[in-house]
C-alpha cells in the first residue's frame, strides 16, 4: 500500500495510490470534511483515546458545565543559576545561585485531557511528553496514536 501523508499542525490527511489513481482517505467521518483528521487527542481517566472531531465532542460532553476542583501539589525546589553582575573595574562576579519553590495546580475533577497542539512540540527538542492522570506519554506515543489511526483507516478503505 502506497500512502501519502500530510501531517499538518492543525489537520492531517492521507491519500492512497493504487497504481492508477490517487484517492483521499476518509479519516474522520464525523468531521465536516471527513478526509481531514483534526489534530486533537482526548485521553480520559480510563486512558481511552479519541481523536479528531470525536476528541472535541468527548471534551465538550464531559467537561462543559462541570464543577472544577483545584488541587495544589508542592514539588521539589529547583536551583536557579544566573550570571553575576559585571562591575566596572572589578571584573565579573560569581554566578548567583538561588532556590525557587515549585508547585503544580491540577483540576482533580477533570474527566480527561484534550491535547490540541502536540505537533507544535515536535520542533522543541527539550519537550519529551506529558503526564495524564499519572501516566507519562512520550511525544512519540502521542504522535503514534494519530499515525496508527491514519494507517488503519487507509487499510480499511
What are these regions (language model features)?
Residues 27-157:
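Phosphate-binding loop and its immediate beta->loop->alpha context
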